[in-house]
């Protein structure tokens, strides 16, 4: 494709705003434990998210987690998704697989939303949480880049929030899909930025952002 065909795409969307939220997508044991059939290599991703989590807490910006778990009734609700990805049945409600990795353990005032599909917005109160905090942007982290991260970034934009994706704080089991998703997000939906840019933005909010 010619450069002219890309003209008007890939403009920077404003980055981290004055009232961001940090969302940590699916850092539950089912995706981080090597014993799980759904595991990704996420150690470096978790280390990057940890830095963002510490910075977000210092700045007192909202932190929201998602996990994925399926009870018996959910297997009917999410039937089409489970048929496409049968390994999702590993994520049984009440099992250790659906608990957040202890390296990123949530605090009592940090909601953990359960989702049945890819986007953090679909079938959850995430949009209401962002509205209640008067957020203007969402720092999207976690896994997988080509699945739930991308879906959440797209839905953030569609709900009126600027999505920002720190490159080092997302991961995928497929490097090609990871790179393609980041390219796509940066071209059309949000800002893909270095981790340090997000850390600097959050440090600049210390003392200014009350929940």
Where are these regions (language model features)?
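Short acidic-hydrophobic, aromatic-tinged amphipathic segments that line or gate anion-handling sites
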Residues: 113, 190-200
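Short glycine/serine/threonine-rich phosphate/pyrophosphate-binding segments
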Residues: 145-152
């Amino acid at each position: 494709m010619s450069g002219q065909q890309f003209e008007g795409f890939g403009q920077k969307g404003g980055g981290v705003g004055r009232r961001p939220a940090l969302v940590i997508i699916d850092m539950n044991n089912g995706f981080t434990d090597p014993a799980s059939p759904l595991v990704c290599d996420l150690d470096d991703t978790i280390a990057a998210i940890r830095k963002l989590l510490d910075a977000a807490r210092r700045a007192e910006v909202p932190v929201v987690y998602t996990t994925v778990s399926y009870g018996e009734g959910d297997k009917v609700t999410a039937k089409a998704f489970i048929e496409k990805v049968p390994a999702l049945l590993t994520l049984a409600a009440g099992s250790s697989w659906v608990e957040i990795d202890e390296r990123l353990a949530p605090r009592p005032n940090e909601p953990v939303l359960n989702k049945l599909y890819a986007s953090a917005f679909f079938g959850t109160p995430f949009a209401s949480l962002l509205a209640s905090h008067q957020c203007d942007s969402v720092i999207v982290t976690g896994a997988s880049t080509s699945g739930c991260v991308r879906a959440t970034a797209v839905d953030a934009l569609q709900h009126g929030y600027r999505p920002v994706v720190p490159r080092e704080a997302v991961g995928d089991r497929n490097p090609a899909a990871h790179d393609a998703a980041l390219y796509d997000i940066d071209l059309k939906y949000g800002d893909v930025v270095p981790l340090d840019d997000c850390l600097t933005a959050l440090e600049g909010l210390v003392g200014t952002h009350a929940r």
